[in-house]
Amino acid sequence: NTALMPDPAMFEISQRFYFDAAHTLQREIEAQGSKRVHGHTYHAEVFVQGQPGDNGMVMDLGLVRQALKEVREQLDHHYLDEVPGLGPATLENLCLFIWRALQPQLPGLSAVQVERHSIGDKCVYRP
């Protein structure tokens, strides 16, 4: 019930998804292993901000999951160097790629985060 919400109520919901992918990367440091084809399990999370509607939700998380499924299919078990529109497979470019794919479908999209837990790397994109 939105009558229980403080005014103005601003919330941020999130949904995670995972994908496994391979890539190469041209780097100045730790270059040898990066130049070879290698893979990671990526953990991504998207955030949607807004005020709850009459249904008490910022957005139905089922709609978020549906949009994520389409993006995940473009990345999961793919060679990222060949994904159109991605560019070099950096965490920064992955965040931007996911943002651009989701932004038209998810009004209120406020951030995209991509992590590689195995090596402790993370990037957050907040325009």
What are these regions (language model features)?
Residues 3-127:
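Charge-rich, low-complexity N-terminal segments
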